[in-house]
Amino acid sequence: MKLIHKLEPLWWILFGAGGFVIGFVLPALILGVLLLGPTSLMADGLVYHRAIRLASSPIGKLFLIVVPTLGFWHCAHHLRHFALDIGGHGAAALGAFGSYGLALLGTIAAVAAVLAL
């Protein structure tokens, strides 16, 4: 059995968790930060010192790592299956290594950026 098939449950877990994050958490984050933040509905909610304090806390750092990382893995799984649909089994390995490699690079970049806070 190929390694990619042995790791398939891991990819599906990351895909499902990423789908949840993209479907539920990201729209709420966009609503809160981009739409309600500039209005008076969240008075002093997004001032700099409160935002940096939240981002520097352990829960904030975990949130800033988990949300983009799971989104990367969700998109990587979609890209892998897209490559499989377009190129057949000949492009499956390249699509898998390419998409999951990009997701891994995105994960490393997200962790490095958050740890630099």
What are these regions (language model features)?
Residues 1-117:
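Membrane-embedded alpha-helical bundles that constitute the cytochrome b-like, heme-associated redox core
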